[in-house]
Amino acid sequence: MLPPWHCAKLPTGKPDVAMQEASHGELRLCKRLQLDAAASSALLSAMRAGDSSRSAVVLTPRAPQDYVPPFPCEDMSAAPWLPPRVFVPQVGEGLPKPTAYEDYRSGMYYMLDLSSCWESAALEQVPTPQCSLDLCAAPGGKSMLMAARYLPQNHTANEVNAARRGILRQNMEQCGVPNVTITGLRPDQWAAEGKLFDLLLVDAPCSGQSLLCKGIRNPGCLGHAMVNGNAKRQKGILLAAVQCATPGAHLLYSTCTYDPDENEKVMAYILKRVPGWEAVDVPTLSPFRSSLADFPAYRLLPHHGFGAGGFCCLLRKKA
């Protein structure tokens, strides 16, 4: 059963207003997601409003175990999936921003979108890794969330783009993430390296459709060309990633887009193409389980109230 906030966020007025104003690409997306009229209207309205972004802070290894953020935070008891050491700042007139504090500048906490925290909730099903690889790591959010859950023993944060790799390095150093190596190899180069990991993170490049719900222009993100191009790239990254996995390893795949071609269909392709892998059930994410897959996969939409949205699926290589 969906939690109370799921229905509470849906519009109660006429659901056809947003539908009448929607573009062909927007209507196509709603159809592909198999949304009913109310959910379609909620998604389209969020794209128009551009105000679905919701910030979170993750405490870094620099913060003591008993550290409490110096700003007021939301009660998140209705979100049992919330990862450890993650807080959601209160927002409103006169409330200070988390970035205004010296603790932020000294690396006690790291700012990111709440949707990213939701995607990392699947790591609750993963035992502490001995050797982990974040293949698409910049600017560092997923590596930071992993470090908050269990301090990495031997972690590699990889980013191909040199400029983004510099930002990644700066964030890892500022936040004091230990035992981390910054690299810039392509996924196929990692596959050729022969080094094996028991946890792989693939926060894949995508069409970024959720940016529209944050008020960020993203021309072409609903079009066939961008979606299909990203889906092809994502499959290539994953086909390389699975070659870097030990028996029993986990792979967390995530995106910040909605289209099934970049999400459920990519996962279905990998599960069919690569023998010996299975999707893992994540009980705390069960209210978000996708109806577009016959295996455990999870999607977040803006009307859920936890940010602009995203997708995640946890895979395990059979021992």
Predicted features and spans:
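S-adenosylmethionine
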Residues: 1-319
